[in-house]
């Protein structure tokens, strides 16, 4: 076997945006992740509300003109 062809495998600290840290083995020195099992809604059982009301209103305003044009076309 050839010597010195494999990457260095060492203990790595994985940091989440929520502040949690986990130690694991990796070839990368430090890892940063956006979400982990300690803050993900699936694992915690908590749901984060997303502002869907604003999105729905924006969608309705966007397509209101389209719907009015379709109704006017059908009335003719």
Swiss-Prot record:
What Gene Ontology molecular function terms does this protein carry? metal ion binding; rRNA binding; structural constituent of ribosome
Cofactor mode of binding and number, as noted: Binds 1 zinc ion per subunit.
Phosphoprotein among the record's keywords? no
* Required cofactor(s): Zn(2+)
Sites where the protein binds Zn(2+):
16, 18, 36, 39
The record's annotation in Pfam families points to: Ribosomal_L31 (PF01197)
Alphabetically ordered keywords of this record: Metal-binding, Ribonucleoprotein, Ribosomal protein, RNA-binding, rRNA-binding, Zinc
**Which PROSITE patterns has this protein been placed in?**
RIBOSOMAL_L31
Q: Which GO terms describe its biological process?
A: translation
Highest rank taxon of the organism: Bacteria
Q: Which GO terms describe its cellular component?
A: ribonucleoprotein complex; ribosome
NCBIfam families xref list: L31, PRK00019.1, PRK00528.1
State the protein's purpose.
Binds the 23S rRNA.
Q: Which family does it belong to?
A: Belongs to the bacterial ribosomal protein bL31 family. Type A subfamily.
Q: Describe its partners and assembly state.
A: Part of the 50S ribosomal subunit.
The name under which this protein is listed is: Large ribosomal subunit protein bL31
The species this protein was found in: Desulfatibacillum aliphaticivorans
Q: Which gene encodes it?
A: rpmE
């Amino acid at each position: 076997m050839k010597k010195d062809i494999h990457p260095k495998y060492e203990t790595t600290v994985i940091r989440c945006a929520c502040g949690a840290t986990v130690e694991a083995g990796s070839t990368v020195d430090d890892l940063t992740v956006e979400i982990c099992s300690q803050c993900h809604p699936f694992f915690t059982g908590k749901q984060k509300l997303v502002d869907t009301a604003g999105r729905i209103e924006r969608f309705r305003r966007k397509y209101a003109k389209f719907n009015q044009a379709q109704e006017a076309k059908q009335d003719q």
